[in-house]
């Protein structure tokens, strides 16, 4: 699978996950960075794919990848935004 993807879930009881997903998509949309939203709640294979790319069998959304390269999770994303290194984080530079 190619391109930037944000792994998310539409089914969660966690306000924290919902908030983190919203913030990631809001920032990407605001910077006009194209991405595909992948809803892992629709298929366990997608959840397994997300966890394999993250290298963490317990990884939870949101997780960001570019092609087959893992970019990071919410915390790393926010850190990149704060340090103005989002292009590098997303492996665009």
UniProtKB/Swiss-Prot annotation:
Which pairs of positions does the record mark as disulfide bonds? none
Query: Which residues are glycosylated according to the annotation?
Result: 2, 9, 12
Residues modified as N-acetylserine are 2
Q: Which domain of life is it from?
A: Eukaryota
Q: Which GO terms describe its cellular component?
A: cytosol; nucleus; ruffle membrane
PTM info: May be glycosylated.
Q: Name one GO biological process term.
A: cytoskeleton organization
Q: Which SUPFAM superfamilies match?
A: Thioredoxin-like
The answer on whether this UniProt entry bears the keyword Zinc reads no
Q: Which UniProt keywords apply?
A: Acetylation, Cell membrane, Cell projection, Cytoplasm, Glycoprotein, Membrane, Nucleus
Domain (Glutaredoxin): give its ranges.
2-93
Which PROSITE patterns did the record assign?
A: GLUTAREDOXIN_2
List where in the cell it is found.
Cytoplasm, Cytosol; Cell projection, Ruffle membrane; Nucleus
Question: Subunit composition?
Answer: Homodimer. Interacts with MYO1C (via its IQ motifs); the interaction is dependent on calcium and takes place at membrane ruffles.
Question: Which family, according to UniProt?
Answer: Belongs to the SH3BGR family.
The function of this protein is: Could act as a modulator of glutaredoxin biological activity. May play a role in cytoskeleton organization.
Record's protein name: SH3 domain-binding glutamic acid-rich-like protein 3
Gene that this polypeptide is encoded by: SH3BGRL3
